[in-house]
Curated annotation (Swiss-Prot):
UniProt-listed InterPro entries: PsdUridine_synth_cat_dom_sf (IPR020103), PsdUridine_synth_TruA (IPR001406), PsdUridine_synth_TruA_a/b_dom (IPR020097), PsdUridine_synth_TruA_C (IPR020095), TruA/RsuA/RluB/E/F_N (IPR020094)
UniProt-recorded Gene Ontology molecular function terms: RNA binding; tRNA pseudouridine(38-40) synthase activity
Residue numbers annotated as active site: 52 (nucleophile)
A Pfam family it matches: PseudoU_synth_1
Catalytic reaction list: uridine(38/39/40) in tRNA = pseudouridine(38/39/40) in tRNA
Assigned EC number: 5.4.99.12
Subunit structure as annotated in this protein's UniProt entry: Homodimer.
Ligand binding (substrate): 110
GO process terms (BP): tRNA pseudouridine synthesis
Keywords of the record: Isomerase, tRNA processing
Keyword tRNA processing: yes
Known role: Formation of pseudouridine at positions 38, 39 and 40 in the anticodon stem and loop of transfer RNAs.
Protein name: tRNA pseudouridine synthase A
Length: 258
C-alpha cells in the first residue's frame, strides 16, 4: 500500500465545502470519485484543512492510500481529465506511509482578499470581497497584534463549531495592500469554524473607523460570539498553504491576480 500526496486547487462557488455531504456536491466527493475510477477501487482522502461552502483553495494538500499500480502521471493527468474544471491537481508525489495531510501539519495559511475600490469589478466579483469605502490598513494591523499567540477564540467561532477547544495559536495576522487589493494573511496551527471570516468581519469595522484597534482585544476577552461583527462572505477566502516538518506548500492568491 502506497501513500500519495496531492496538491489541489479549486474554486469553491459550486460546492458545499470540502467535506462530503449527502445533500450537496463537495470537493471531497468529486476528488474521491475521480481517484476511485483511476485506481479501480474505492479511494478515501484526507485533507489539510476542511474549507467551508464557497471557500477556495490554491494549495490544498490531500493524501490517500492505494495499492493500485499506477504511474504518478495517472494520479495527476488521468484524474484531472475526470475532474470538473473548477477542481484540479497541481502536483502529486509518493510520501512516507506515516504522513497524514491533516495531523502532520504544523500550520496552515489563509488569504482573505478585499477589492477596495470605489467601483466594483465584474471580473473579480466572485473572487474577492468588494469594499467601496476607504480602509485604514494601519489600524487594522494594530488590531491584528491582539490576535497573535495561543488564545481562546470563542468570540470568533461559529455556533456550529464542533472543535473540542476554542484555543488556537496564531503566528501571523497581517493586512497587505497591493494596488486596489488588500490581502489579509493569517497563519495558525488550525482554525475554528468560520473563525477567519469572523475575524475579517470585525477587522473591517476597525478599518472603517467604527471601532478602535483595542476593540478587538475587548471582543477576544469577552469569549462571546455576539460581541464580534458579522461573518465576512465566503468568496474572498482562500486556503493557500500548509507547512509540514519535511516540506511546505504555498501559493498566495494575490500573485495569481497580479
Amino acid at each position: 500500500m502506497k501513500n500519495y500526496l496531492l496538491q489541489i486547487e479549486y474554486f469553491g462557488k459550486n460546492y458545499c465545502g470540502w467535506q462530503r455531504q449527502s445533500h450537496s456536491p463537495s470537493v471531497q466527493e468529486e476528488l474521491e470519485k475521480a481517484l476511485s475510477k483511476i485506481a479501480n477501487q474505492n479511494i478515501e482522502v484526507t485533507c489539510a484543512g476542511r474549507t467551508d461552502t464557497g471557500v477556495h483553495a490554491t494549495s490544498q494538500i490531500v493524501n490517500f492510500y492505494s495499492n493500485a499500480d499506477r504511474p504518478l502521471s495517472a494520479w495527476q493527468r488521468g484524474v484531472n481529465a475526470l475532474l470538473p474544471q473548477d477542481i484540479k491537481i497541481l502536483a502529486v508525489q509518493q510520501v512516507d506511509n506515516n504522513f497524514n495531510s491533516r495531523f502532520t501539519a504544523i500550520n496552515r495559511t489563509y488569504n482573505y482578499i478585499i477589492y477596495n475600490s470605489a467601483t466594483s469589478s465584474p471580473i473579480f466579483a466572485e473572487h474577492c470581497l468588494w469594499e467601496n469605502r476607504e480602509l485604514d490598513i494601519d489600524k487594522m494591523n494594530q488590531a491584528c497584534e491582539y490576535l497573535l499567540g495561543e488564545q481562546d477564540f470563542s468570540s470568533f467561532r461559529s455556533s456550529q463549531c464542533q472543535s473540542n477547544t476554542p484555543f488556537r495559536n496564531i503566528q501571523k495576522a497581517e493586512f497587505i495592500k497591493q494596488g486596489s487589493f488588500i490581502v489579509f494573511e493569517v497563519v495558525g496551527n488550525a482554525f475554528l469554524h468560520h473563525m477567519i471570516r469572523n475575524l475579517v468581519g470585525s477587522l473591517l469595522k476597525v478599518g472603517l473607523g467604527f471601532e478602535s484597534p483595542e476593540w478587538i482585544k475587548v471582543v477576544l476577552e469577552a469569549k462571546d460570539r455576539t460581541q464580534a461583527a458579522e461573518t465576512a462572505k465566503a468568496h474572498g477566502l482562500y486556503f493557500v498553504g500548509v507547512e509540514y516538518p519535511e516540506f511546505s506548500f504555498k501559493r498566495q492568491i494575490i500573485k495569481l491576480f497580479c
